[in-house]
Amino acid sequence: MEAHDAHVNSEESENPGAAPYGNFINYYTFNPPENRLSLIPEALLQNIGFTSGDGERVLMLDVGCNSGDLSVALYKHLLNKEACTSDSPRQELYMLGFDLDQDLILRAQTSNPFPQNIQFIPLDITDDTESRAVLQAFLGKFGCSRFHLSTCFAVTMWVHLNHGDAAFLSLLSRLASHSEYLLLEAQPWKCYRSAARRLRKLGRSDFDHFKALKIRGDMAAHAREHLEKQCSMELVQCFGNTSWDRSLLLFRRQ
């Protein structure tokens, strides 16, 4: 979900645990969108002061969107359109989803039921120069300086494991700089150990930074501390924990 041109290969097709960047090819079969949507209010946009039916354009960003299943489901969820189809009236809600894996993005683009409102692109969030340029270009089309709501589900660990402590904090800072509100799901530390164990079982070398990481323990608390102390954001609500025991935290720019 955040590095390299990580195309899906035959080994990853046979063993999804071999996706060291989180780019699982069958992710939503074992963690379906409902696991998160059941915790997120349908009226979230209205609750935070944004609407999509009165001419106001609302911009959303989904970081590490994989094959787009959750992105599309969340789009429909927030518009209260369970039976939403491509023929439904266009709403003023626009979403940009990206992932590092071009094969997953191609699947997202091919299956996208709302191409006029949802755009999927390949992008590496750890490439600061490129990601900043691409996101600012998208925002510029709408005359906005930030996304009204950004979502980052289960991405932080992969950036952290593959790029280290500094990249973990930089990711949070970058998301904060582009967002009015940020909905964050940070993987807990036990997931780090599980990811490393999967690689070892496959006979692969360990994550480059795993043993050297100094930021450990309560990862949601570490993320919150950085966002509040370094990024001028504040925690406004916790929507509870998913079935995988991961908290969904909503932050607001102060």
Curated annotation (Swiss-Prot):
User: Which catalytic reaction applies to this protein?
Assistant: a 5'-end 5'-phospho-ribonucleoside-RNA + S-adenosyl-L-methionine = a 5'-end (5'-methylphospho)-ribonucleoside-RNA + S-adenosyl-L-homocysteine; a 5'-end 5'-phospho-ribonucleoside-RNA + 2 S-adenosyl-L-methionine = a 5'-end (5'-bismethylphospho)-ribonucleoside-RNA + 2 S-adenosyl-L-homocysteine
Could you cite one Gene Ontology molecular function of this protein?
Answer: RNA methyltransferase activity
State the Gene Ontology BP annotations: methylation; negative regulation of pre-miRNA processing
In this chain, S-adenosyl-L-methionine is annotated as bound at R36, N66, D99, D124, I125
What Enzyme Commission number(s) does the record list for this chain?
A: 2.1.1.-
What's the domain of life for this entry? Eukaryota
Q: What does this protein do?
A: O-methyltransferase that specifically monomethylates 5'-monophosphate of cytoplasmic histidyl tRNA (tRNA(His)), acting as a capping enzyme by protecting tRNA(His) from cleavage by DICER1. Also able, with less efficiently, to methylate the 5' monophosphate of a subset of pre-miRNAs, acting as a negative regulator of miRNA processing. The 5' monophosphate of pre-miRNAs is recognized by DICER1 and is required for pre-miRNAs processing: methylation at this position reduces the processing of pre-miRNAs by DICER1.
Question: This chain belongs to which protein, by name?
Answer: Pre-miRNA 5'-monophosphate methyltransferase
